[in-house]
Regions:
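Conserved AMP-binding/adenylation subdomain of ANL enzymes
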Residues: 1-12, 19-120
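Short, surface-exposed connector motifs at secondary-structure boundaries
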Residues: 10-12, 126-132
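Active-site glycine-centered loops adjacent to acidic/histidine catalytic or metal-binding residues
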Residues: 18, 138, 161
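Short active-site oxyanion
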Residues: 36-37, 131-134, 154
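Extended, domain-scale alpha-helical bundle/helix-rich regions
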Residues: 51, 134-135
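Active-site loops of AMP-binding adenylate-forming
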Residues: 141, 150-154, 162-174
Length: 174
């Protein structure tokens, strides 16, 4: 049910895990079931370029990928100064409030709207501009990483299952 709202007609997937990986192997069945277009990344070094070329709607990866992404984005965010730093901090803070369904004040709603237009939209564009969700699987995703990615406009789901039976049988929102 979590995937229904994000599955469009012929959704675009970008994959970079080895096809022999049990998680990726299972994801292939989903891609076939939803008649998705599948793009294969040339390499991890070219992943961002491939995302901009393929404009994926759904991307699956293991938690280590999202942990690395979290660290790289934080390095960039930590270099920000002045109003840019304030906007980034508000984007994360208010994004987490929205994620955890906490009520925003009128001022916070206005600031969150500004953050959406100036920060989150720019981040989304860096990931191809069409991303509807990341799906993490093959291990537990750190809640801090998942909530951070969601808060900055990169919707992230936590997939889970048993490798022995099937690596992903369901997804939870972070």
């Amino acid at each position: 049910n979590l995937l229904k709202p994000i599955i469009s007609k012929c959704p675009r997937f970008l994959t970079w895990l080895p096809l022999s990986h049990s998680y990726e192997h299972t994801v292939q069945f989903v891609q076939i079931a939803v008649a998705g277009k599948v793009f294969y990344a040339e390499s991890i070094e070219k992943l961002i370029k491939n995302m901009n070329d393929s404009r994926p709607e759904i991307m699956t990866a293991v938690p280590r990928f999202y942990q690395n992404l979290f660290q790289k984005i934080n390095v960039t965010f930590n270099k920000a100064r002045g109003i840019k730093k304030i906007l980034i901090e508000q984007t994360v803070k208010l994004g987490k409030k929205v994620l955890f369904k906490e009520k925003l004040s009128l001022v916070e709603m206005l600031i969150n709207f500004i953050c959406e237009k100036l920060v989150r939209n720019k981040i989304k564009k860096n990931f191809g501009g069409s991303l509807k969700t990341f799906v993490s699987g093959g291990g537990a995703l750190d809640v801090e990483v998942g909530s951070f990615l969601n808060s900055i406009g990169l919707p992230t789901l936590q997939g889970y299952g048993l490798t022995e039976a099937s690596p992903v049988v369901s997804c939870n929102p972070i």
